[in-house]
Each structure stands twice: as C-alpha cells, then as structure tokens.
C-alpha cells in the first residue's frame, strides 16, 4: 500500500538498498537513538571515516571528510575531492571552496548552520566500481546526521541518489526526497561550484536556486 504514495525514484532507491542488505546499518544502541548528542555524532562520524580510510588504505584526517556542524538539519553534499582537497586535507577547498562559501554566505549560511561532506572520498578512475561501498557509507552517514534538508551540489550527486543520468540543467532548482527505512530526507539540487567556475554564465541560475532553497529552509527550520 505504501508504494502508491512514493515516487518511482524513491521506490527504486529503496529496492536498490534492499539488495545491499542495509536495513539495519548499525547495531550499536547509540545509533538507534533519534536524538544523539553532538559528542556522540562526532564519535560516530569519526568511526565512519576510519572505515573509509581502512577501505581505501588512506590516512585522511577529519577535515578532509567534513566541515561544519553535525547537529545541523542542513546537510550539503559534494561529489568527490579534487587535487586541492587532497593536498590541503580539507573538503571543498581552494577556489571551489571559496566560491561555495560565497554562495552559502549569500543566503546567510555559515558553517555553524550546515554540515558539509561528499559522497565519494577518492578520485580514482574506477571510483564508480565502488558505488555499493559508497552507497552503504552514505546511508550510515545520513542515519548519524539525520538532516531535514540535503543540498545536492551537481548532477553527479543528484544522480547518485536517484540512480539516474540526468543533466544539471534539467534538474537544478528542483525538490525531491528519499526515504530510508522510516526516515525522510528532503533534497534540493543546484550547481557544483566547480562547474560554475568553468561556466560562469550559470551563476544566475545558481543564485535563483539558492534563493529558493533559502526561502524553504528559513520557513520550516
């Protein structure tokens, strides 16, 4: 009966996750709680990032994995680290990070008001061969942070959520949602700042997206 109330993309995503057997991701009682403390969230994300480092045989620090406030109801997701991020050991750094900061400041979002991370944490050519691993990581990540809103930066991130191949000009500025177990996450897609650096003509579209996102979150948070 539930399926008739869900979009096809949500149904497909749920069915995909069921094939990965990720209905109960954490057995620890802490992770079953609806209201974790800031300290518990930090501990859990650190454990998650250790799992990623172990899988990738890397020693990246926490600044490479996230920025901002784990208690925020606003999560921002980029795609994968670029050379600046790897060199600086900091997520979305360099010119891309500078532009993102300006974009977020324009809608009064400083790093205490959001939690920023990626869906991928390496940039190897076979990265998509690890999609199952990264989908599992993302589900764990969402269950820890429990954001109400997720701002998706670019088509790679949006398509990762929806198992699709849409172009950013077709999907930017659009709301959607996913449901994982009983948790609902509202998503909104806009441009990756790295794309805007190469295609500045799309900055006006990005600004319209951000205003739309701002109006929604300040009305409901």
Annotate each language-model stretch with its function.
Residues 2-24:
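N-terminal low-complexity, Ser/Thr- and acidic-residue-enriched intrinsically disordered segments
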Residues 16-19, 23-221:
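A polyanion-binding, active-site-adjacent surface
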């Amino acid at each position: 009966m539930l399926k008739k109330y869900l979009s096809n993309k949500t149904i497909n995503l749920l069915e995909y996750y069921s094939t990965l057997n990720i209905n109960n991701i954490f057995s620890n009682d802490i992770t079953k709680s609806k209201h974790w403390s800031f300290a518990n969230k930090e501990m859990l994300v650190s454990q998650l990032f250790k799992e990623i480092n172990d899988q990738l045989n890397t020693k990246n620090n926490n600044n490479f994995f996230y920025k901002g406030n784990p208690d925020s109801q606003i999560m921002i997701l980029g795609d994968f680290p670029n050379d600046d991020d790897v060199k600086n050991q900091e997520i979305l750094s360099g010119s891309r990070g500078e532009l993102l900061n300006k974009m977020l400041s324009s809608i009064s979002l400083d790093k205490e008001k959001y939690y920023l991370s990626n869906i991928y944490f390496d940039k190897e050519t076979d990265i998509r061969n690890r999609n199952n691993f990264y989908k599992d990581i993302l589900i764990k990540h969402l269950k820890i942070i429990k954001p109400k809103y997720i701002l998706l930066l670019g088509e790679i991130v949006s398509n990762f959520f929806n198992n699709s191949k849409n172009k950013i000009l077709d999907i930017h500025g659009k709301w959607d949602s996913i449901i994982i177990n009983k948790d609902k996450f509202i998503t909104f897609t806009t441009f990756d700042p790295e794309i805007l650096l190469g295609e500045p003509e799309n900055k006006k579209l990005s600004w319209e997206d951000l205003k739309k996102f701002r109006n929604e979150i300040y009305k409901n948070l």
